[in-house]
Amino acid sequence: KDTNGDDRADIKEVLFSGWGVGDTHAGPSNLRYGFDNWIYGTVGYARFNGSIGGKQHNFGMGVFRFKSDASDIEFLHQFNNNTWGLGFNTAGDVFGSTANNNPTFYGGIPATIYNGERKMSAKMIADTPAFHPITPNIRQVDAFNAYTAGCGHAFATSDAFPEKYRDRAAFVCGPTGNLVGSYNIIKKGAGYTAKNAFSFVASADEWFSPIVAEVGPDGHLWIADWYNFIIQHNPTPSV
């Protein structure tokens, strides 16, 4: 809290600790306010291992939520990689994206429902992880021509979008392909399936590295561009 107007925090309060710091791109991200008044977020393999309210928690690679007073935290959806995307449709269903060819997941039943029993892992619902850059000059070293660094998963919930997009199109960034892709999220039984809908934005600028795309207060799509030729931690390929 800034108490004297100098734009610096004079009062700092640690809500809880326990986040792994061994790898910066595997830590927590995507904090956002949920429909249920909890704060949601994602974490990668750096994990969380700490005690809150007298209860020990240890989880990683998926979606969590916590109360704003830090009195409780819950791990909700188990994904299979560093999780960099998080989104909700208007029904409040939870979706996400991860590294390594996993651009869209549906959370499904929260892990808290199982009361300590074996938890169900979320499944990737995309028909294909392929993306569609408009230049051959892209840099990837572990997965090729696909969402190796999928991040963001915002839905087109604004009336500013054409009707065919509303609450159906999800925007997943592919910084290693210099693009923002989209998937059509389609109801299927008790879950969803996702159909690749090509690129929503793509650039031939090799430094264009979108890392999140969200619907802004004006109803339009806002894009955060890291703008860096190297977006990953991986070494320069030898071939």
Regions found by a protein language model. Give the residues of each.
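Beta-propeller domains with acidic blade repeats across secreted/periplasmic ectodomains
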Residues: 1-239
